[in-house]
Amino acid sequence: MTTNPNQRESLTAISQRRLQAVKSKSIYVLPNAFTAAALFSAFYGIIAAMNSDFLSAAIAVFFSMLFDGMDGRVARLTHTQSEFGVQMDSLADGVSFGIAPGLIVYEYTLKGLGKLGWAIAFVYALCALLRLARFNCNVGVVSKNYFQGLPSPAAAALVCGFVWLCVEGHLPDFAQPYTSEIAAVVTLYAGLTMVSNAPFFSGKSYAVVKTIPFWVIAVGTLLFIVISSNTSLSIFVLFCLYALSGYAYGFYCYWTGRPNPIQADIARSLAQQQAEQAEGDVH
């Protein structure tokens, strides 16, 4: 049995489409694999905390941050963004930056505060989930230049950074008897700041440039040296500064009379919705 040229071309086209479908499915696995890796790191951190290996537990959450920062970039680079990936990433973030840090800090030191300790850990986890839900609802409302409230990865870094700091013995001697109380304050601050309207710089407005100024290289090198010399202390201090920056910028806007970018975006969105509703009522 022989096939004519038209049939051969048709079979070739079908084969190419099937091959393209297989490639597409394999590429879609790539960004979700990073999301799964972030979730695995957080799960490992929980298991490590249950086994009193708090150093590994804290560092595991930072690995979750690393993988979480890569999945979206990989999806954009490979043009494989999907609604499934968005939802999976959000659910994984809830575990990685909400549940895991709350359990780790509770097992490490908040347990000593009794019921108050687990209540604080729960408030943190709840605030992280509320933060993620609000972020999903406000896509397209709030400018990408700012985060509305402290991002959940930064909050997790603040909480787990404190655990890491304490495990390595960098907490001052006079503060060590109050480790549980300090952890409670840090955890509550991180949780409540996530659901605040404080504007935090996202860094998404900076485009990739071909040339880098010398001062940027110098500052980057200095930061690398400082972090390398005392990783846990440097990371905790950096995230403390970032966690305070949103309130500082909000106060600056209030003091100078400039509009708060988050409040301005929300007001603009509400005005647009009211205008569209009014236009619909007219028609």
Task: Report residues per predicted region.
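Topogenic membrane-insertion module of multi-pass membrane proteins
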Residues: 1-69, 249, 283
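C-terminal membrane-associated helical module and adjoining short loops/tails
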Residues: 1-19, 144-283
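C-terminal ends of transmembrane helices
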Residues: 73-82, 129-144, 149, 195-204
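Helix-coil boundary and interhelical linker segments in multi-pass alpha-helical membrane proteins
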Residues: 44-59, 99-119, 162-182, 228-233
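Hydrophobic alpha-helical transmembrane segments of polytopic
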Residues: 34-37, 57-64, 120-127, 155, ...
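Multi-pass membrane catalytic core of lipid/isoprenoid biosynthesis enzymes
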Residues: 28-35, 77-132, 162
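"…together with the soluble PPM/PP2C metallo-phosphatase catalytic core" -> "…together
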Residues: 23-34, 41-54, 59, 112-139, ...
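Alpha-helical transmembrane segments of polytopic integral membrane proteins
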Residues: 43-46, 63, 101, 126-129, ...
